[in-house]
């Protein structure tokens, strides 16, 4: 994909900046729009959002090279809607599109007039602009967006999503989500009683026509070749946007532990680098935080969570489905090593699912029917969310000191609290011990999925997932593979679709969950320490 001074020819990338007439600059769109794609009323913005204006100025003005500036491309009506004292917009090359030969401007400084979008992009691909202009941003209005939004030259769309209902008379075309995927979405903001958020969408495929030619089904298994992104490099994004991808929360924590972590011993004898007291916050409203810098075992995430929800403590249930993540802690050798010599192989004891569904019940073995025994915390969580959403005691705990000695492994992710506001469900989970290489990518996805499932059965929208970690550690034998992972650039997170017909937490099966747009880097092997 073209980068900072990129040009395209006949819809294809070209690394050259030679001023050939058939070459055009690529560009990014910056726009604020309502949920029905309204962008204006009576020739003006129908909202007053100072933070949005600040964002617009920052993204269109910032450059990575001090000697360069950005270009902003707009139609004549958009130009005229800018107050006279602010025209032209400072620090940027203002490119105004008009077919009117009599169009007059107050000053020629930093202003260029072009007759069409294509002629403007050709001009910006030619000298001197090919060398002096770093990025090109298209800023409106409606007709310009209709020409520019979903065509191959558009690399990204920086959209301020207005969630409040506001009357408009000017509209932009909808974003084509078959070719654009969300890169980053801010947490919602409220300003002047208007709720909104900032979202950047990046192009991942050449065109809707080419995607349609592949017969892409959005519910296909994510391993299908038809789900792979055509665009592999997203370095065209402004740095201020690129670094907001939420995967960097994880990557920066890993990098920090490798660089600054305390050397510690551990029960496995492997040795770790460790930091204490960390937090990551993920936005579940549009994306699903399944890491992309390595392939995460999605089927394993789903099946393990369903296993927890069922209350099962039998590792063989997962083994029969090809899920072997608990094999090490369920083996005969391991159970004997922790003093559970009378425990049947595969019986993990009163671990997560048992505590979620039968807290306080007396544990015998994995075969016993515990129906009606103990306290069903998960059902209690769902009932409180439905009946008393402002309750501050919506808690799910896997930590039961009485049962710890009976568990093959005490719970690492041990405590979750749920919170309802604005029709959204958020979850904060505390994890006492966090294996950053193998465990945390799984844990992030698992509790994000649990939050989405509970929101779904309670007719709420997923909100935030806040991951609080006590001992965040990297095993010594994971340092090298994690350093390999740190060299991978994140890709857009996928989105999650849940079967709308399922409304009972106990009714879900793995086929009820579909990922759309998961195209990670390759799997990176790391050895489990037990």
Curated annotation (Swiss-Prot):
Region (Disordered): 1-20
Any single biological process term in GO: methylation
InterPro entries cross-referenced by the UniProt entry: DHFR-like_dom_sf (IPR024072), DHFR-TS (IPR012262), DHFR_CS (IPR017925), DHFR_dom (IPR001796), Thymidate_synth/dCMP_Mease (IPR045097), Thymidate_synth/dCMP_Mease_dom (IPR023451), Thymidate_synth/dCMP_Mease_sf (IPR036926), Thymidylate_synthase (IPR000398)
GO MF annotation, one: thymidylate synthase activity
Residues that hold dUMP according to the record: 267, 413, 431-435, 443, 473-475
Annotated region (Thymidylate synthase), positions in chain: 206-530
Matching Pfam families: DHFR_1 (PF00186), Thymidylat_synt (PF00303)
Keyword check for Lipid biosynthesis: no
EC number: 1.5.1.3, 2.1.1.45
Binding site for NADP(+): 32, 38-44, 76-78, 97-100, 140-147
Recorded catalytic activity of this chain's protein: (6S)-5,6,7,8-tetrahydrofolate + NADP(+) = 7,8-dihydrofolate + NADPH + H(+); dUMP + (6R)-5,10-methylene-5,6,7,8-tetrahydrofolate = 7,8-dihydrofolate + dTMP
The DHFR domain, residue ranges: 26-203
Active site: 412
Gene3D superfamilies xref list: Dihydrofolate Reductase, subunit A (3.40.430.10), Thymidylate synthase/dCMP hydroxymethylase domain (3.30.572.10)
UniProt record similarity statement: In the N-terminal section; belongs to the dihydrofolate reductase family. In the C-terminal section; belongs to the thymidylate synthase family.
Name of the protein: Bifunctional dihydrofolate reductase-thymidylate synthase
